[in-house]
Swiss-Prot record:
PANTHER family: PUTATIVE PHOSPHOTRANSFERASE, TRNA 2'-PHOSPHOTRANSFERASE 1. Coiled coil: none annotated. The keyword Transferase applies. This is Probable RNA 2'-phosphotransferase. Keywords: NAD, Transferase. One of its GO terms (molecular function) is tRNA 2'-phosphotransferase activity. It comes from the Archaea. Its EC number is 2.7.1.-. Removes the 2'-phosphate from RNA via an intermediate in which the phosphate is ADP-ribosylated by NAD followed by a presumed transesterification to release the RNA and generate ADP-ribose 1''-2''-cyclic phosphate (APPR>P). May function as an ADP-ribosylase. GO terms for biological process: tRNA splicing, via endonucleolytic cleavage and ligation. Belongs to the KptA/TPT1 family.
Length: 177
């Protein structure tokens, strides 16, 4: 059940807080109490402790609690100001997608589409699993992080295993697995 509640939290915090009567601040934070009340519209038994446990156990670090407020750390489809630490260490990152997207990617690079940032993974497995959400015929792109930095792109640490960047130019894609 934790998975379903976490998915609802991600939907609310990343895409549709207003649908649930929430007003995020410029960084995407909302009151934990208000989020609990919003989630209770679907899962009436949810408590603040349960929400905090989801945040604590989340392997990807999707959520952030600051004081009595909570937000999604990445994946927003509405404008938010993210002040994440820059990743200056990674040499290689990965992006999972489905084969049908390759032609466009190899022409225009990886674009954020309906989100603010392109999501990259620090390992192959997570990138592959991300790609699987979009179909069976998954390919994993190898991203040269140094190339991104040399072109002036900032790679941000959005979660424990997730990095975000505004765009990945074609020439920073160093391979396809």
């Amino acid at each position: 059940m934790r998975f379903k509640v976490s998915k609802l939290m991600a939907y609310i915090l990343r895409h549709s807080p207003w649908e649930f009567g929430l007003e995020p601040d410029e960084e995407g934070f909302v009151s934990i109490e208000e989020l609990v009340n919003a989630v209770r519209k679907v899962y009436p038994w949810v408590t603040e402790e349960y929400i905090r446990e989801i945040v604590e156990r989340d392997e990807k670090g999707r959520y952030e609690i600051r004081g009595n407020k909570i937000r999604a750390r990445y994946g927003h489809s509405y404008p938010v100001i993210l002040r994440h630490e820059e990743d200056k260490e990674s040499k290689v990152l990965y992006h999972g997608t489905v084969r049908r997207n390759l032609k466009g990617i190899m022409r225009e690079g990886i674009k954020p589409m309906k989100r603010q940032y392109v999501h990259l993974s620090i390992n192959y497995e997570d990138a592959y699993n991300t790609g699987r959400r979009h179909g069976e015929d998954v390919v994993v792109l190898i991203i040269d992080a140094e190339c991104l930095r040399n072109k002036g792109y900032k790679i941000l640490k959005a979660g424990k295993k997730v990095r975000i960047v505004k765009h990945v130019p074609v020439d920073c894609i160093s391979g396809i697995l």
